[in-house]
Regions:
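Phosphate/nucleotide-binding beta-alpha loop and adjacent structural elements of enzyme active sites
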Residues: 1-202
Length: 202
């Protein structure tokens, strides 16, 4: 079973680990919206997974503004990175209201959902270099499920974990996840309440 250089969950189609990876890196790029996943480059050792990640297997609703509407309605380009499972993205809804734009621009699709355990099993993953998560408020749910799995399978704890920590998730939830990782042998590298938090395995 291979070592994966990276697993990136929630890629959209910009600033991805896939784009900066080299030809020897083995990775997974996970994105529930195929319109963005398909725009990413194809690399020999990187697998694209068209799914959402959560704490259960099945299906979930994802809310997003299609790229053609972003362009036609002259909406901010970063809307394409604001796709949210379970409910509309609060920043998108607020921005549309402030711009006097219709909330009907927000579409809803049903997408397949996998747990980290399923993702790891399906791809025969033995170890992970970097786990990067950017899922617009769903990061702590994914990480709590992942940590619980790794506590029984410690070799699958990633060397580096990078996840989004901003207003889309509660600070208490962020701190609880960080403390669980610290208790499992990580050290805090950087903590930014408006951007990302990074931890490394000691």
């Amino acid at each position: 079973m291979p070592h994966y250089t990276f697993i990136e969950i929630g890629t959209s189609d910009f600033e991805t680990l896939l784009e900066t990876s080299n030809d020897t890196d083995i990775g997974l790029s996970v994105e529930p919206l195929s319109v963005y996943l398909n725009k990413l480059p194809n690399k020999q050792n990187v697998t694209k997974v068209n799914a959402a990640i959560s704490d259960k297997n099945g299906e979930m609703s994802i809310y997003y503004v299609p790229p053609e509407i972003i362009l036609a309605a002259d909406l901010p380009w970063w809307f394409k990175g604001c796709n949210s499972v379970g409910h509309p993205h609060p920043t998108v809804s607020k921005c549309l209201s402030e711009m006097g734009k219709s909330q009907d621009f927000i579409m809803c699709d049903t997408v397949p959902v996998k747990t980290m355990e399923t993702l790891i099993f399906e791809n025969n993953i033995e170890s992970i270099g970097t786990l990067k998560i950017d899922t617009e408020g769903h990061d702590c749910i994914i990480l709590n499920n992942y940590i619980t799995y790794c506590e029984k399978n410690p070799a699958l704890f990633a060397k580096t974990i990078n996840f989004e920590t901003n207003v889309l998730s509660l600070v208490d939830d962020q701190e609880a996840v960080i403390n669980r990782l610290l208790n499992n042998g990580y050290k805090l590298v950087s903590r930014n309440v408006n951007e990302n938090t990074v931890l490394e395995k000691i």
